[in-house]
């Protein structure tokens, strides 16, 4: 293996480059986070909430499916190639939004955004885990997610400001083309992590070669730890898909401006990103189980808080709490999966987990849209909050501590 060593400090240049790249990955989602639901209503005349949220459904399902295959593909052709392919596909997203003449073009652009995110974010995550020692995984994942969600938050604020100053479209999306080009160029300088992966695999006990089908079964239902984490991940992003789609409508109906909505919509992922700097490392010290369980309960409480207060400052507090609750679980999910899965099939197991987690975007938007159309937006938010509550109970009663 030559001079190849595991550990963040031993690979600080590559590790830092991957952090910067994931910042740009996050920019891609943040670009449309605060404004695309409103574009559907104002530019394309959508009156049904379900129709307006169809772009999140397309994003969620495409990202989920790509996550599943990205891990398997990366195990075969290497992480770097998958990363570059992801950026290449991402270039079409802002271009399609700019030229879109009908809503289906926006929906298709978000299919491509889901593919872009599934490939790029998965690879920056897996490569950091490859580089880190086993007792650094929570911290490594925390840094990765910190960078990504700070990117989401920053671009949500910037795009909201540009939309208020100029228009909802096309001005904010010119930045998207620049983001993709920079992300692709930075990724050219990445070195693949296959040698680091081989070192760790040699240190582990020999593992039977298992099929992709078996990895899917273990991660989805037969392994109590992996399957409990997968359900909690799905519940977390189901809540996020609902928040992404309904928060702009909820706050517009409360009389807030685009700028104010941009701030609230940005604070949530900003807190989500920032606090992962600490929660990932904390899980390396105190364990994964109770950090996940309590984080799920904080998310549920935060949604009910947002629902029942009616002051801008208190909505900001609610968004902050929602971000903290999500930060408690997000890096801990991936670290716990890495604790359980053998290096030889870890990326595949991570892909299955991320398949279920990110399908939550689609299920959340679908459920929220149906509930909002049948009842109202407030009822939709309140009912969706039950899922994180139940997931926390499942983690508390079914999952064992994975950090040993």
Where are these regions (language model features)?
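Structural signature of the two symmetry-related core transmembrane helices
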Residues: 81-95, 290-305
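Juxtamembrane intracellular "pre-TM" segments in multi-pass secondary transporters
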Residues: 1-12, 194-229
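Helix-to-loop junctions at the C-terminal end of transmembrane segments
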Residues: 66-78, 163, 276-287, 372-373
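Cytoplasmic helix-loop-helix junction between adjacent transmembrane helices
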Residues: 111-149, 335-336
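Helix-loop boundary and gating motifs at the non-cytosolic
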Residues: 10-60, 225-228, 232, 236-254
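Paired small-residue
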Residues: 93, 104-112, 302, 313-321
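Symmetry-related core transmembrane helices of the 12-TM Major Facilitator Superfamily/SLC fold
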Residues: 171-188, 381-396
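Residue-level signature of mid-helix packing/kink "hotspots" within the transmembrane helices
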Residues: 59-68, 152-153, 269-277, 361-362
């Amino acid at each position: 293996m030559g001079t190849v060593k595991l550990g963040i400090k031993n690979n600080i240049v590559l590790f830092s480059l991957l952090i910067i790249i994931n910042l740009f990955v996050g920019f891609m989602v943040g670009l449309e986070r605060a404004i695309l639901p409103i574009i559907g209503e104002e530019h394309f005349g959508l009156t049904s909430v379900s129709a307006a949220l169809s772009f999140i459904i397309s994003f969620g399902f495409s990202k989920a499916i790509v996550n599943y295959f990205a891990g398997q593909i990366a195990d075969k052709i290497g992480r770097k190639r998958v990363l570059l392919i992801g950026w290449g596909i991402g270039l079409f997203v802002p271009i399609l939004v700019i030229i879109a003449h009908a809503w289906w073009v926006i929906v298709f652009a978000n299919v491509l955004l889901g593919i872009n995110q599934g490939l790029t974010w998965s690879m920056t995550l897996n490569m950091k885990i490859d580089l880190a020692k086993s007792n650094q995984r929570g911290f490594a994942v925390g840094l990765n997610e910190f960078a990504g969600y700070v990117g989401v938050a920053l671009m949500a604020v910037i795009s909201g400001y540009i939309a208020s100053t100029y228009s909802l479209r096309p001005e904010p999306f010119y930045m998207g083309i620049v983001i993709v080009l920079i992300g692709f160029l930075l990724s050219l300088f990445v070195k693949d992590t296959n040698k680091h992966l081989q070192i760790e695999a040699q240190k582990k006990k020999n593992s039977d070669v298992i099929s992709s089908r078996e990895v899917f079964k273990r991660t989805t239902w037969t392994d109590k730890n992996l399957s409990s984490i997968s359900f909690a991940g799905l519940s977390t992003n189901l809540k996020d898909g609902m928040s992404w789609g309904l928060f702009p409508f909820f706050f517009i109906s409360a009389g807030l401006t685009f700028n104010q909505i941009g701030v609230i919509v940005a604070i949530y992922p900003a807190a989500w990103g920032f606090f992962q700097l600490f929660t990932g490392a904390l899980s390396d010290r105190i364990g994964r189980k109770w950090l996940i369980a309590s984080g799920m309960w904080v998310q549920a409480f935060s949604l009910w808080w947002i629902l029942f207060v009616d002051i801008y400052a208190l909505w900001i507090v609610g968004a902050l709490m929602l971000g903290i609750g999500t930060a408690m679980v997000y890096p801990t999910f991936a670290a716990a999966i890495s604790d359980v899965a053998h290096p030889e099939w870890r990326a595949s197991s991570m892909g299955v987990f991320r398949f279920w987690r990110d399908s939550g975007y689609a299920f959340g938007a679908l459920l929220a849209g149906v509930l909002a159309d049948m009842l109202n937006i407030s009822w939709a938010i309140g009912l969706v909050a039950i899922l994180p509550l139940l997931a926390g109970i499942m983690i508390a009663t079914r999952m064992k501590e994975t950090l040993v």
